[in-house]
Amino acid sequence: MKRKDTLKDYRGKSIDQLQEVKIELLQQLFSLRMQKGTGQLKKNHLFKSAKRDIARINTIISEKNK
């Protein structure tokens, strides 16, 4: 149910708010890459989750632009 809740939350936001969330996720993804490079990252599944959330936000932004 978590995914449906986040989708409803994303769809309820404006495009500017979605852009801010996207920037936060991109920063998180960068941080994860740095942690992986230094060997500090133990939860590799967070990459996939962050990338999918970014893709979801991009999809919703493109839907709202139409």
From Swiss-Prot:
Q: Name one GO cellular component term.
A: cytosolic large ribosomal subunit
Top-rank lineage group of the source organism:
Bacteria
Keyword terms, alphabetized: Ribonucleoprotein, Ribosomal protein
GO molecular function per UniProt = structural constituent of ribosome
**Gene Ontology BP terms:** translation
The keyword Ribonucleoprotein belongs to this UniProt entry's keyword annotation: yes
PANTHER family xrefs: 60S RIBOSOMAL PROTEIN L35/50S RIBOSOMAL PROTEIN L29 (PTHR10916), LARGE RIBOSOMAL SUBUNIT PROTEIN UL29C (PTHR10916:SF0)
NCBIfam families reported for this sequence: L29
Q: Which family does it belong to?
A: Belongs to the universal ribosomal protein uL29 family.
Q: What is this protein called?
A: Large ribosomal subunit protein uL29
Q: In the UniProt record, what gene is named as encoding this protein?
A: rpmC
